[in-house]
Structures are given as C-alpha cells and as structure tokens.
C-alpha cells in the first residue's frame, strides 16, 4: 500500500484487477514532455512565492531534466503500478533527488489541474502543427492554380456535367476550404489559451500562489478564472476533434474526386506510381490507396469526436474518472490528421494533369446551355424562364442529333431567336471568362482568389 499516494485513507491494498483497469500510463505517457514542462513551471512559481527554497527548485528542475532524458533515450522503466504518467515521473524524481524534496513538487497542485494542463499543452501544440501542415497543402494547391488558369475541365452538380471551369478554379475551391480549417484551428487555439494549473482539485488552494506567473512561463494568454471549470473543461479537446473532423470532411471530398478523376472513366489526372499500389491477382491494376485510406480514416476521426462528446455529455462537476478516456481519441486523431496531411500533400505534388482529357470531357453534357440562356436574357431581353425553355429545346434537338450543343453548326435553324453572335458563345474558354461576378471562374477572378490565399498564408 505504501506505493499508492492515497493509501493513508485505506485499510487494504487495491486489487490487482483494479490497478490494471484503473491505470492510464500506457496512454498518457505520450504527455511526458508536457508533464515535465508543467512541473518545472509549477515549481518555479512555488519558489517565487516562497513555498519552495531556491535549492529545492534547482534540485527539482535538474531531476526532472534527468527524467526527461531517460524517457527520450528509452531508459525509463514504465510500471503500470504507477497508474499514470504524473505519478511515474514523480516517483522517479523522488528516487533521483529524494522524497523529502521530490514530495514537495505537488504542493498546491492536484492531478486534476495537472492533467488538464498537460492535455492543454499537447492540444495547443497540435493546433500549431496542423496549421503548418495545412499551410503547406494550400501552397501546393496554389502552385497548381497559378499554372492551370487555362486548363479547362467540366464542373459537376449531382455528378452531372454543369459548366466549364479551369483546373485552377477547381483546386482553389479546396484551398479555400483549408483556409477555413486554419481559421477554425486558430479560433480554437485562442479559446484553449487559458491555463487550468493552480485550480487544484476543484476549489483552488489555500497557498498564496501566482497562477499568472505559471501562465506566463507556459505560454498561456491567461488563467482559467474558475477553478471548478478549470478542471472540468474539455471543450478544448472537443474543439480540436471537431476541427480535425471538418478537415477530414474536406480532404475526404478531395480524395473521393481524386479517385474518380484518376479512374479510366475520367482520366483527368494520373496519380504517381510512387503513391499507388497494385493488385495481388490483377496485373493491370493501379490503385489510389492513399486517397482511399484518407477517405476511410475519416470515419475514425468522426468516431473520436462522438466518443468524447458522449463521455462529457452528463458528467457532474468537477472531475470524474470518465475523463481519463479523453486522451486516446485526441492522440489518435492528431496523429491520423498529421500523417494524412503529409502524405496527401506529397501525393498531390506528383499528380499529372491530363489537359486534353479534361477538355474533351467538356464536349459532353451540354455545358454551354446556361451561357446561351444568359445570352437570350442579356441581349434579347427575354425573361430567364422563357430563355431556359428555349435552350432546353436546343439541348433536346442536340440529343436527337447525337451531338453536344457545342457542336451545333447553326443555332438559328433550331430557333430563329439566335443570331450569329450567339454562335460565339459555343466556346468553352469564352464561357469561362465571360463570368463577371466576384468569385467566379474567369481568369481575372481566379487571379484575385490566388492573391487572397497568398496574403493569408503569408500572415500565418
């Protein structure tokens, strides 16, 4: 029983089943760096308040640095009997510097505020890492956007041909999604920038501590103003899980289209052999496994979000052991997101854009129909609904002839309302650049969109 820090209250030792079931060390040892960082800050604060002596602080810092080195070098022995990373580090610290000094580190601190601090430090770091990876992915997309302003391809609604656009315009749509993802992470990071350390178990401490100093040392903007909220809050973890879930919503959509566009039915792009796999039985196969795995991993990150929402949904204040289950999903989602963004960016850098196939695909689906309708409204003063009907008839006649409307030689033979000027509209590049609204597919608009994104990433 002497190995259990709370054994003074109990008359019998914990059952071995309980020790194993209760332990979180195999999961939360990921936080060793954050735990040591938080402990050094806490000890520094205690010394500044006269609670620790200078020589005690020096011994604690030196001992914690040795513990960190042992863990990093793989020399540290993790023992499940220590229950969690906090007690494992504290026990080893006391072995190094003696329990008389090592036992003073936990003054004015509970594991409740300690773990919340460790967890927040990890979450804050993860925000910054993900923002960097998203920035790199946006930059890759911008490089394509600069080169392919005149690479014409079909756009789709309901997976049916809609209107001609450029590949630049298409890839910029995803770049703007990622820009919102960055902003979402920035907003969540700001909300997470409040330190729980010093909240203790749930009601603060009777020691005259300086929480603001701890916040300054650890790089937090401010402290959590309510101790009970400080140890109970896991919004910061939920926010990160949600942000990652939305990132995967966007990357999964992109990957789905990369899968479609690289198929024989489309052949708009070719994925590099370096990022493709083959079949164990079919020699001809070239599979887009990177995209399929990212699409599949989306379910995992969604599940991690739902899991933590469910854990937190009915917990009474303040800390509950249920919250021990908050970390595994975060660790998994963060690693999954980082790995996926890195390989997605690497894969995208090596795709081949098949311009001719994209252009040929525009000759299907009557994609210039809207341009003809707009022409009738603009030049002939015909109400749009009537123009819609007239052009619908043109499409029907083209269908009968087995051609696309872009291949019609004389529109006036179908309806006399069309003149020779209308024939000029049957051109994909003209259609693309005729758009005048902000945010449209025209080259001028695309260039503005590129400038917006470049300005954004330059300020990150």
Curated annotation (Swiss-Prot):
Molecular-function GO terms, alphabetical: argininosuccinate lyase activity
Under the heading InterPro entries, the entry gives: Arg_succ_lyase_C (IPR029419), Argininosuccinate_lyase (IPR009049), Fumarase/histidase_N (IPR024083), Fumarate_lyase_CS (IPR020557), Fumarate_lyase_fam (IPR000362), Fumarate_lyase_N (IPR022761), L-Aspartase-like (IPR008948)
The answer to whether keyword Chloroplast applies is no
Q: Which UniProt keywords apply?
A: Amino-acid biosynthesis, Arginine biosynthesis, Cytoplasm, Lyase
Q: Which pathway is this protein assigned to?
A: Amino-acid biosynthesis; L-arginine biosynthesis; L-arginine from L-ornithine and carbamoyl phosphate: step 3/3
Instruction: Show the GO cellular component annotation of the record.
Output: cytosol
Pfam hit, one:
Lyase_1
UniProt-listed Enzyme Commission number(s): 4.3.2.1
Q: Which Gene Ontology BP annotations are present?
A: arginine biosynthetic process via ornithine; L-arginine biosynthetic process
- State the reactions this protein catalyses: 2-(N(omega)-L-arginino)succinate = fumarate + L-arginine
Task: Please give the chief subcellular localization of this protein.
Answer: cytoplasm
Where found in the cell? Cytoplasm
Similarity remark: Belongs to the lyase 1 family. Argininosuccinate lyase subfamily.
The name on file for this protein is: Argininosuccinate lyase
Give the organism the record lists: Campylobacter jejuni subsp. jejuni serotype O:23/36 (strain 81-176)
């Amino acid at each position: 029983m002497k190995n259990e820090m709370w054994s003074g209250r109990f008359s019998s030792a914990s059952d071995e089943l309980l020790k194993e079931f209760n332990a979180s060390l195999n999961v939360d040892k990921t936080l060793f760096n954050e735990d040591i960082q938080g402990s050094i800050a806490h000890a520094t604060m205690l010394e500044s308040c006269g609670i620790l002596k200078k020589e005690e602080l020096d011994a604690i810092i030196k001992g914690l640095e040795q513990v960190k080195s042992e863990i990093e070098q793989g020399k540290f022995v993790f023992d499940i009997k220590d229950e969690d990373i906090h007690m494992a580090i504290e026990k080893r610290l006391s072995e190094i510097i003696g329990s008389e000094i090592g036992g003073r580190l936990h003054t004015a601190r509970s594991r409740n505020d300690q773990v919340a601090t460790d967890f927040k430090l990890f979450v804050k770091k993860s925000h910054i890492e993900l923002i960097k990876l998203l920035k790199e992915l946006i930059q890759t997309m911008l490089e394509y956007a600069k080169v392919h302003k005149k690479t014409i391809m079909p756009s789709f609604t309901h997976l049916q041909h809609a209107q001609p656009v450029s590949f630049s315009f298409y890839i910029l749509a995803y770049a703007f999604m990622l820009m919102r993802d960055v902003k979402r992470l920035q907003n969540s990071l700001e909300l997470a920038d409040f330190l729980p350390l010093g909240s203790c178990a749930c009601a603060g401490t009777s020691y005259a501590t300086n929480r603001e100093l701890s916040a300054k040392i650890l790089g937090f903007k401010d402290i959590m103003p309510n101790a009970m909220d400080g140890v109970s809050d896991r919004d910061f973890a939920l926010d990160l899980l949600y942000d990652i879930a939305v990132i995967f919503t966007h990357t999964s959509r992109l990957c789905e289209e990369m899968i479609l566009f690289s198929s024989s039915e489309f052949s708009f792009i070719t994925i590099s052999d370096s990022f493709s796999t083959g079949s164990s039985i079919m020699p001809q196969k070239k599979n887009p496994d990177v995209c399929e795995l990212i699409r599949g991993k989306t379910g995992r990150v969604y599940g991690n979000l739902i899991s933590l929402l469910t854990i937190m949904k009915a917990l009474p204040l303040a800390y509950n052991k249920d919250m021990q289950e908050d970390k595994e999903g975060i660790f998994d989602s963060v690693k999954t997101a980082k790995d996926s963004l890195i390989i997605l960016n690497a894969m995208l850098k090596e795709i081949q854009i098949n311009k001719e196939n994209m252009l040929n695909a525009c000759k299907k689906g009557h994609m210039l129909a809207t341009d003809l309708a707009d022409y009738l409204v603009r030049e002939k003063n015909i109400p749009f609904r009537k123009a819609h009907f007239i052009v619908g008839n043109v499409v029907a006649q083209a269908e009968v002839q087995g051609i696309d409307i872009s291949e019609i030689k004389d529109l006036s033979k179908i309806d006399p309302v069309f003149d020779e000027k209308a024939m000029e509209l049957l051109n994909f590049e003209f259609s693309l650049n005729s758009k005048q609204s902000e945010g449209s597919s025209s080259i001028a608009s695309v260039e503005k969109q590129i400038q917006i994104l470049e300005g954004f990433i330059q300020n990150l």
